[in-house]
Amino acid sequence: MIKCLSVEVQAKLRSGLAISSLGQCVEELALNSIDAEAKCVAVRVNMETFQVQVIDNGFGMGSDDVEKVGNRYFTSKCHSVQDLENPRFYGFRGEALANIADMASAVEISSKKNRTMKTFVKLFQSGKALKACEADVTRASAGTTVTVYNLFYQLPVRRKCMDPRLEFEKVRQRIEALSLMHPSISFSLRNDVSGSMVLQLPKTKDVCSRFCQIYGLGKSQKLREISFKYKEFELSGYISSEAHYNKNMQFLFVNKRLVLRTKLHKLIDFLLRKESIICKPKNGPTSRQMNSSLRHRSTPELYGIYVINVQCQFCEYDVCMEPAKTLIEFQNWDTLLFCIQEGVKMFLKQEKLFVELSGEDIKEFSEDNGFSLFDATLQKRVTSDERSNFQEACNNILDSYEMFNLQSKAVKRKTTAENVNTQSSRDSEATRKNTNDAFLYIYESGGPGHSKMTEPSLQNKDSSCSESKMLEQETIVASEAGENEKHKKSFLEHSSLENPCGTSLEMFLSPFQTPCHFEESGQDLEIWKESTTVNGMAANILKNNRIQNQPKRFKDATEVGCQPLPFATTLWGVHSAQTEKEKKKESSNCGRRNVFSYGRVKLCSTGFITHVVQNEKTKSTETEHSFKNYVRPGPTRAQETFGNRTRHSVETPDIKDLASTLSKESGQLPNKKNCRTNISYGLENEPTATYTMFSAFQEGSKKSQTDCILSDTSPSFPWYRHVSNDSRKTDKLIGFSKPIVRKKLSLSSQLGSLEKFKRQYGKVENPLDTEVEESNGVTTNLSLQVEPDILLKDKNRLENSDVCKITTMEHSDSDSSCQPASHILNSEKFPFSKDEDCLEQQMPSLRESPMTLKELSLFNRKPLDLEKSSESLASKLSRLKGSERETQTMGMMSRFNELPNSDSSRKDSKLCSVLTQDFCMLFNNKHEKTENGVIPTSDSATQDNSFNKNSKTHSNSNTTENCVISETPLVLPYNNSKVTGKDSDVLIRASEQQIGSLDSPSGMLMNPVEDATGDQNGICFQSEESKARACSETEESNTCCSDWQRHFDVALGRMVYVNKMTGLSTFIAPTEDIQAACTKDLTTVAVDVVLENGSQYRCQPFRSDLVLPFLPRARAERTVMRQDNRDTVDDTVSSESLQSLFSEWDNPVFARYPEVAVDVSSGQAESLAVKIHNILYPYRFTKGMIHSMQVLQQVDNKFIACLMSTKTEENGEAGGNLLVLVDQHAAHERIRLEQLIIDSYEKQQAQGSGRKKLLSSTLIPPLEITVTEEQRRLLWCYHKNLEDLGLEFVFPDTSDSLVLVGKVPLCFVEREANELRRGRSTVTKSIVEEFIREQLELLQTTGGIQGTLPLTVQKVLASQACHGAIKFNDGLSLQESCRLIEALSSCQLPFQCAHGRPSMLPLADIDHLEQEKQIKPNLTKLRKMAQAWRLFGKAECDTRQSLQQSMPPCEPP
């Protein structure tokens, strides 16, 4: 029959569940005092009688309220459902006092209301309330006192499970946590058993000061404030910049209510440990003591310190999950977790404590916690309507993926400019404001010659524009003296100029910054470096950039196509172009200043490729603006690369000498000959300004500065500066071709993630990860495009150089069309003197413009940690357009141009010789028409398939990975009819060895062009059909080589990879296929394993992931020949066999295994046999097997060979079927460890105590150990228990933070003696401190339960066992080996050494070896042979003996 429970039973059940501990009782009473707006709360606890008293000075209660207080569901804090949905107090159910009254034998509540004289009191006995009455003793002030007597008197089991000493510490911890959110309230805690004041926290101003009161000044000084708001959640509080050895200093509050063990704790703890350097263990001597308690663990961990409060609406969460209200559930976990993640990340970046998460950490976090980190980028509020979507996305990329690793950099002063006059100073300040501090730098020049830096709009009267794109650019104009500096806006035009000279420039810019080099007349060359911050650069540049389409500014252009250019970086350098007259004019103005300014940066979505367009053939009246470079983003074209007809060469001394004059921060060129300019014949009647660009960069890990003096037609340095050449006449200057040093943009191999790509190329300046790179220097991962004129007849310099020389042969005719430049790479080890003579005869013009670029291949030197980069930036960006080929030419030219004496270039000289042979054959046919010559050019940066309209011969701009050439469009043509198959095969195979596995290149054949087809204006001889065919072939080849399409999602701010075959998408870059020879042999068979229980499974031990990196690259020639066949147009599709198509197909579901993973013919059969044996016959050692071991002998003075029986039945005989090797050092170490453990305990145990006691040694004088107040209290409470572990404490009254250790375990003293005997420092104090901290942690976490042997003691004993054990190379006799194995068999854990490493290893089961079968004798045949011997053999023997007896002996004469 169902009946209703009585009210008393209901109260008992409810109260027993609601009040589970004494600490919770204290917390409920303290929260009531805080709700009463008390300014002082005092707590007194007696753990012997379970008495609690809480006194406050709050509002107090009158007689009516005292009469109702303590009744269930009576409260003054909540009166309606609206109050319940939006509570303003901690309590709202009216049950706390009623539950406490039910759990205690007596409860007394006395209260006095403010401005009254009477004090009222109410008593509860055994849960029943007595009538309230006036108290005999009047309170001194208003407030309430609640006294609880004999708590849990009816629940003895609950009392017993609570350790009084540990429960008191929990009470203290609860009050401390409560006080952190209420610093304006004073708290105190008194222990009535000892009469000591345990906690006394006066009022303070803020949380940080309260933290200082609790944990000391040292901890509080490390606190850093955090404040963050996202949607309905707001974070506030403090995070420490140092870590702690446990989680006791982690406090998380929700609306000032402490919560425990939530997802938020896991997330914050993970972010502080993995995404910051806070919890990274430091190896310095100062932090060793802090981490000493965890040194015995394999991976010592530190934990963050934080006090964080989350403010939100009460409807967002439910805290009533359990009575203590420390568990919480949120309505929208994702929003809160994202708020926490972004807030902590922002804090770490501000404090320079941020490190990038690794993929392994993120995966491990998701698997362990059931929820993953958020990848979505925090959207910022748009302050201006003019900002477009792609700019927002780029802002997000910059904000989300910046790295703020702590880096050590050389100290340098900021470059300051003196104020020449007040007018220009005010103008510069106004300019700074107009540009929103976009890093405008003003340099004051002290020399007599001063360049006027101007950037006017392009007005090219003689050029025809075939395609034009523009970008708004804000420039700074440094006007004449007396004029104000104006903030102008000019437009940059990119155009393909079809002028008579056919000159166009190409520039490939990088988001990295290079040093600026300025040269003044009569002055030394100074190298200025800019040191800027990433935050200001990213914010200011993106804030003020806009793309506007204003084709009206280009009135002289015949055809203008205006469109915004996405994801491009536009940089521009201000340079001067002046005639000799202007220089003389300006030389008198000594107060003139040069203004150099950074350009603004655009981040959109196609490429970082930019062009520089030269203003050609201007009239004398326009001399000032005659030579300007303009930049626009977009892909380059072959026409712009090879369209230069005139040239200019620069002679420079040895780069080594030049580099030696450069310091790390600033370098000087002492002689003017270093920048001497030679002008070759050409259009000498056109006044054109020339300038030389200098660049310093850091080479490898040597950090050496190297200067390269470059001429100027195709500037290809990132963040370049133009330096005016004032030391030469400018009346007769010509355009010239310039060596290009191109920064190869590629992913670093350290992180290997797409986030790294966006981080590196999505912002202006980035603190690089690699050691050899700095944000203020050009990285050394560069490729060259060089078209200089090198004097080939200078035999001495050519032959004595250590690098491959690059020679340009260019034909100068009277008409305006120019020949394409060709290049020779000459090797020191493979000189072709005949070819050089041939070249000298054919190129007379080379003798007139000498130039030797020594050590030029230093630009191509690649840092070791970047050599694994497999994809260039251009190939990634080309995939975004959908019509480009992915190339993997990273490091091809870099490796090729290295010094021959380096280890990594042993094969390069061979390549050089092959290339030289091919080029000599090419030059022999220089003036012939190119017939069906496939001209491979590695050009992963430009892929527009457009060609020079002024050249007479045709070059191919397609890409191939089989040619070892630079990344930039360096024409390396060869004639198929001239190059033998052997040479090309050597070239192909050598390049294959250099770059590993290659994609299939797309090949194209272009129509040959007759020499007479070129005229002065140039002819575009590529028809629309050929363009369409080229595009289609490129797409087909791209499909063959990669089934993945890249797409940049603006909303997510991430790159998405979409599989063209299946439509599946992923954020992770897919890996390339591994090509291996497809052969079948013994290694391809599967192994069937039958277990003892009858189950069967199949395994293929050869197909392990561990051996994939060591796959043999067999039959690579077949793959290369197949790729060579694709270079022809007709065989592009037809040569695709079913097998080749299948090898390129990437299964989207299952990973494909190679056909042959290990080549057993190369000496790996033995290891495979062991692996198969271990799979087929797994063995598990037992202690019973050790007794059956039979010692054979010692092996190599390191191991003991034994036979062990694996049979389950015991026959008592030694020996067996399994051959094992026993490590003699590990075995003896285990024997010594167990013996030392036995000897460490006292032999006779005390009467009545079931625990063993460690032997101790008395220290004279006692050891002084500094502890915290909490640790001292715990040690005082548990000092009797710690005596069993050999520790004896004395607590002096003079200091609260000091204990004296009178006795320590005996092994500690023995360890100290060994250390001192070896001349080392004392270790006893550090070991004792670690031992004490370990035991205190164990007391708090396990409730006082002790383990068998403390880990610290075991570690000391293991060290002693190791030092005294038998070492390797100690010879042992058979008897000594037998005694060692016998002692090992008596150990408790014979299979491991003292440190946990295995002591024995099975080799083989002799039962599985092939036994030698003895053939049974054929008795019938033996019988017949015996009979035959008796009949014939015996008679013959008798006859021989008779003849010997009848013959006389031979006597000597």
From Swiss-Prot:
InterPro entries registered for this protein in UniProt: DNA_mismatch_repair_CS (IPR014762), DNA_mismatch_S5_2-like (IPR013507), HATPase_C_sf (IPR036890), MutL/Mlh/PMS (IPR002099), MutL/Mlh/Pms-like (IPR038973), MutL_C (IPR014790), MutL_C_dimsub (IPR042120), MutL_C_regsub (IPR042121)
One record GO biological process: male meiotic nuclear division
Subcellular location: Nucleus
Main location: nucleus
Tissues showing expression: Ubiquitous.
Gene Ontology terms for molecular function: ATP binding; ATP hydrolysis activity; ATP-dependent DNA damage sensor activity; centromeric DNA binding; chromatin binding; mismatched DNA binding; satellite DNA binding
Biased composition (Polar residues): 935-944
Keywords, sorted A to Z: Disease variant, DNA damage, DNA repair, Hereditary nonpolyposis colorectal cancer, Nucleus
Region described as Disordered: spans on this chain: 624-650, 933-960
CDD domains cross-referenced by the UniProt entry: HATPase_MutL-MLH-PMS-like, MutL_Trans_MLH3
Illness association: Hereditary non-polyposis colorectal cancer 7: An autosomal dominant disease associated with marked increase in cancer susceptibility. It is characterized by a familial predisposition to early-onset colorectal carcinoma (CRC) and extra-colonic tumors of the gastrointestinal, urological and female reproductive tracts. HNPCC is reported to be the most common form of inherited colorectal cancer in the Western world. Clinically, HNPCC is often divided into two subgroups. Colorectal cancer: A complex disease characterized by malignant lesions arising from the inner wall of the large intestine (the colon) and the rectum. Genetic alterations are often associated with progression from premalignant lesion (adenoma) to invasive adenocarcinoma. Risk factors for cancer of the colon and rectum include colon polyps, long-standing ulcerative colitis, and genetic family history.
Family, similarity comment: Belongs to the DNA mismatch repair MutL/HexB family.
Subunit structure: Heterodimer of MLH1 and MLH3. Interacts with MTMR15/FAN1.
Full protein name: DNA mismatch repair protein Mlh3
